Amino acid sequence: PPRRTRLMQVEEGGDFAFEGEITNYMSATSSVSTDDYAVLNRLSITVKVRFTNALDEKMSFNRTFTAFEDYESTRLLSEVEGELIPQIVDKLVTDIFQASASNW
């Protein structure tokens, strides 16, 4: 669902700026069975974000955010990436927005 905010995206001259890059993209076992077989795998994405608040420099930050989704180990990563990446990105966007807007 779309986010409801009065903020508007502008190409330049904005009060807030976000920059960032993906620093980690990893799939690893997240749960094993009693006989040591992987039951669930976890796709994790980590991003480093530089947030600049032109109105209050004290609110600016450089932070790392990580979000993940688990998937059944019987499925290949290539089968689930298209489904999981949008879910993970949505979590990252929410976390980053909340961190930048926490004192509004």
What kind of feature is each model-predicted range?
Residues 4-9, 57, 98-104:
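Surface-exposed helix-capping loop/turn segments at secondary-structure junctions
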Residues 4-5, 13-60, 68-79, 90:
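Surface-exposed short loop/turn segments
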Residues 81-104:
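Compositionally biased, intrinsically disordered linkers/stalks adjacent to structured regions
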